[in-house]
């Protein structure tokens, strides 16, 4: 938890990332009253309900930035996933593009690579991966790369996603916040992750959701049973897929 010294009253802002077409997790979000919701990218791929997720985010999110999977669906390019996810990404990309409407694709294409804004006196920089590589830069919490990344921006809080693991880390005058993944967390627990900024304080949160519902929908996706098993395993274990995918 990070508390900004001398912070005045701030809006309540819910921050989500890496939904990956998991509508059941999104609809189970426990926050019902907030001033704004921000989405840090990767609305689509892997999961069974991309169209509904895109429309939800389009309707609810005040600020959304583009993730590597949004970019892949929007422009028919490689999302450049890590080896354990390459096959799953390729298989579900085809499904996602078949299911998404022209309106969905137009929305994904138009998403910015990053967004800067100020809430009262606090400066925010929102980007899916990292400032120097907005779509693909992979920076875990303890990466030395963050020392350089924070020098490239002028912000009190740098909000990122991409790694699917939540963390809060301060470097100099900048605090880096990763809310984790709402739709495909890699925490070792089957709990959806997000963050809340309220009254000058940011905190990481997680919650259970009807995973069985998402698993049943994955079974209906036109991909191989092995790939279905791998996707469900990731959700159930909060870990990398098995079976060499």
Indicate where each model-derived feature is located:
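Acidic, His/Gly-rich catalytic cores of divalent-metal-dependent hydrolytic chemistry
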Residues: 169-245
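Core catalytic region of metal-dependent phosphoesterases/phosphodiesterases
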Residues: 12-103, 109
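Active-site-proximal beta-strand elements of phosphoester/diester hydrolases
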Residues: 12-20, 123-130, 176-180
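Short acidic-hydrophobic surface loop/beta-edge motif
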Residues: 113-121, 169-171
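Anionic-ligand binding region
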Residues: 140-177
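Active-site metal-binding loops of divalent metal-dependent hydrolases
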Residues: 17-19, 41-43, 68-71, 129, ...
């Amino acid at each position: 938890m990070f508390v900004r010294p001398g912070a005045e009253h701030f809006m309540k802002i819910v921050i989500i990332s890496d939904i990956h077409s998991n509508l059941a997790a999104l609809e189970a979000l426990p926050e019902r009253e907030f001033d704004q919701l921000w989405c840090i990218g990767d609305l689509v791929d892997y999961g069974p309900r991309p169209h509904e997720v895109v429309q939800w985010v389009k309707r609810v999110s005040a600020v959304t930035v583009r993730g590597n999977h949004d970019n892949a669906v929007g422009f028919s390019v490689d999302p450049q996933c890590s080896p354990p996810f390459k096959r799953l990404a390729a298989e579900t990309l085809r499904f996602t593009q078949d299911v998404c409407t022209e309106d969905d694709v137009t929305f994904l294409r138009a998403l910015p690579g990053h967004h800067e804004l100020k809430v009262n006196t606090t400066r925010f920089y929102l980007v899916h991966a990292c400032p120097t590589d907005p779509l693909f830069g992979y920076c875990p919490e303890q990466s030395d790369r963050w020392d350089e990344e924070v020098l490239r921006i002028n912000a009190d809080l740098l909000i990122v996603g991409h790694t699917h693991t939540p963390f809060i880390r301060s470097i100099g005058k900048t605090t880096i916040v990763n809310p984790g993944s709402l739709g495909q967390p890699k925490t070792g627990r089957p709990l959806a992750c997000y963050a809340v900024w309220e009254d000058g304080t940011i905190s990481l949160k997680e919650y259970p959701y009807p995973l069985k519902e998402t698993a049943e929908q994955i079974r209906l996706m036109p991909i191989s049973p092995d790939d279905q098993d791998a996707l469900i395993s990731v959700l159930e274990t909060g870990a990398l897929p098995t079976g060499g995918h």
